[in-house]
Amino acid sequence: MKKQLLLSAVITAFAVPVGARADTPEYRLVLQNHRFVPDEVTVPAGKRLKLVIENRDPTPEEFDSYDLRREKVITGSSKGEVWVGPLDPGSYRFIGEYHAETAKGRLIAK
């Protein structure tokens, strides 16, 4: 019985995502017609944050940012999450790699 309780406690401890706190800022981006809306988002510098990207297009898109060192494929008509930061003050570009001519934007950390 004690082993089962210990095992349950260990599994529960690792099941909670790191950084999933109520005070973690969350920002939403929508991909529609192969464009990010909004295409510019101001975020707090020095904080870890979550980007929730909703792809309203029927085709997949890859959120890609060399500046943020992140990439994530988001299938059509679905959502994805990207965790970034803490960020230094500055501008961080991102694109939708499959439609880079139109799907582009930036985070501005202040």
Model-derived segments and spans:
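Bacterial N-terminal signal peptides that target proteins for export
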Residues: 1-7
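Extracellular/periplasmic metallocenter environments
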Residues: 23-28, 35, 74-110
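Beta-strand-rich interaction surfaces with strong enrichment in secreted/lumenal proteins
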Residues: 39-41, 69-73, 83
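Short beta-strand/loop motifs in extracellular/secreted proteins, especially
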Residues: 49, 59-61, 103
